[in-house]
Amino acid sequence: MKFETISPNGVSITLGSSQDGDTNKVASPKALMLSSLAVCSGLDVVSILEKMKVNLEDFKINTKGSLTDEHPKYYNKVLMQYHFFGEDLDQEKIKKAVNLSITKYCGVMEMFRAFAEIKTEIHY
């Protein structure tokens, strides 16, 4: 089952539930929430690090969520793993950028705090 939604800025997004064997997989609404959390924080972190003149070869965020057992099922625990790649990375600046994102700038993070315990890890 699939649904198309149009965001306020006019972008079309297809969401739904994929069954085993589906050739046209779609993201579930809950999976999109985790993706939104990662992108929100990632945008902050990259912007802050650019202002700090930190050069990265690559940057990735993995998010993992644990759902409650009872309905309505929602994420009650989320692990965010920040992975930074490059030579001579300034770990203090990276820690500061991640901290600013998770404590000050990322609005999606603030929304998640209302219902989930969020843990973060930084990997170099």
Model-derived regions: residue spans:
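Extended beta-strand/beta-hairpin segments
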Residues: M1-S35, V46-Y124
